Amino acid sequence: MIEILHEYWKPLLWTDGYRFTGVAITLWLLILSVVIGGVLALFLAIGRVSSNKYIQFPIWLFTYIFRGTPLYVQLLVFYSGMYTLEIVKGTEFLNAFFRSGLNCTVLALTLNTCAYTTEIFAGAIRSVPHGEIEAARAYGFSTFKMYRCIILPSALRIALPAYSNEVILMLHSTALAFTATVPDLLKIARDINAATYQPFTAFGIAAVLYLIISYVLISLFRRAEKRWLQHVKPSSTH
C-alpha cells in the first residue's frame, strides 16, 4: 500500500501531470452539478407548486423521467446516444459538447440532481406554515416579495436535512463518471488496479477518500443545521 500511495498520490488527489484527476475532478463534478442543479431546482420548485397545470405538468414530467430512470442509463444516453443523432453531429456546438465525456457527465449529474432537488424544494414550499403566508398577504406583500422574504427562506431551512442527503448521494453518483472516461477518483483507482493487480488496495484507498469527503460534507451540513434550524428544535424540559 505504501508503494502505491507513494507512486499514485498525485493522480489520486489532483493531477497526473497533464490534467486534473482523482479527488479534484470528483469535487469539480459534485460542485458544478449541485450548484447548477440547485439553482435550476429553486425556480422549477416554484413552478412545481403552481396551480397552473401548463406550468406544473412539464416540470412534473421532467422530474418523473429523471427520478424514474437510473442515472447510469441517463449518462449512457448523453455520452453514447446523443452523438449518434444527425442533428447533434450536424451542429457545431452540439457536436463539440457531446464529444466531451466531462460535459456529458456534468449534464447527466446536473439534470438528475435538479429533478430530485426540485421535489425536495417543492415539498418544503408546501410545508411552509400557512400562517406566515397569510401574514405576508395581510401586510400587502407582492407574490415576488412574499417568495423572496417569507416562503423561500423558510422552505430552504425546511429542506436542508433532505438536501444534505441528496448532496451526499450525488457525491457517490460521481463514481459513474468513469463510464464516460472522466478521470475521477474511481477511474484512477481502476487504473491503479490495472497496473498493480491489487484491487483491495486500489479500491480501498478510493473508499477511504470518499469517506473523508463525505465526512467533511456531513460536518458542514450539521453546522448549517445547527445555525439555521436551532429555533425549530423542541426545548428541553426538566
From Swiss-Prot:
Keyword annotations: Amino-acid transport, Cell inner membrane, Cell membrane, Membrane, Transmembrane, Transmembrane helix, Transport
Taxonomic superkingdom: Bacteria
Pfam families: BPD_transp_1 (PF00528)
Domain ABC transmembrane type-1, residue spans: 23-221
InterPro entries: AA_ABC_Transporter_Permease (IPR051322), AA_ABC_transptr_permease_3TM (IPR010065), MetI-like (IPR000515), MetI-like_sf (IPR035906)
Gene Ontology MF terms in the entry: transmembrane transporter activity
Residue spans crossing the bilayer: 27-47, 59-79, 105-125, 158-178, 200-220
Chain ranges on the Cytoplasmic side, renumbered to this chain: 48-58, 126-157, 221-238
Topology of the protein relative to the lipid bilayer: Multi-pass membrane protein
Periplasmic topological segments: 1-26, 80-104, 179-199
GO biological process terms, semicolon-separated: amino acid import across plasma membrane; amino acid transport; L-histidine import across plasma membrane
Subcellular localization(s) per the UniProt record: Cell inner membrane
Any one cellular-component term (Gene Ontology): ATP-binding cassette (ABC) transporter complex, substrate-binding subunit-containing
Primary role: Part of the ABC transporter complex HisPMQJ involved in histidine transport. Is also part of the ABC transporter complex HisPMQ-ArgT involved in lysine/arginine/ornithine transport. Probably responsible for the translocation of the substrate across the membrane.
Subunit structure: The HisPMQJ complex is composed of two ATP-binding proteins (HisP), two transmembrane proteins (HisM and HisQ) and a solute-binding protein (HisJ). The HisPMQ-ArgT complex is composed of two ATP-binding proteins (HisP), two transmembrane proteins (HisM and HisQ) and a solute-binding protein (ArgT).
Family according to the record: Belongs to the binding-protein-dependent transport system permease family. HisMQ subfamily.
Protein name as it appears in the record: Histidine/lysine/arginine/ornithine transport system permease protein HisM
